[in-house]
Amino acid sequence: MTPRFDLIGMATTDMARTLDFYRRLGLDIPPGAESQPHVEVTLPGGIRLAWDDAEMVRSFDPDWTPPTGSPRHSLAFRCADPAEVDRWYAELTEAGYEGHLKPWDAFWGQRYAVLHDPDGNGVDLFAPLPEAD
């Protein structure tokens, strides 16, 4: 048997703010989870997404420090249509989350935008552009 991809784990320095961000994007995160040091949800298709607070990470990796600089990964959320990309970007930035790249029509045929979650991780919003007539 070969290993099977199963979980994306992220460290967070503010569990409540992080979970609020991902709840706004539609993830079904249980109420009260923000008080836990480890939270995970199962996404459609079975992949799990998990967050550990800084103290939890340091419990098994005492030398861990939050990364700095630009994100090295991003999570991409498909929206229903290009207008939804704009709407979600506006809603999240108006709620105080960091917008990195405002929505644009990408040359690869998608409406695209990039935000950062509260820990600076890249979060992309995208939707296919209508085909040109």
Task: Please annotate each region the language model reported.
Residues M1-D6, A11-A33, L43-E98, H116-D133:
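Glyoxalase I/VOC metalloenzyme domain signal
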Residues L101-W104:
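Active-site/ligand-binding-proximal alpha/beta "capping" segment
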Residues F107-Q110:
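Short, small/polar residue-rich loop motifs at catalytic or cofactor-binding pockets
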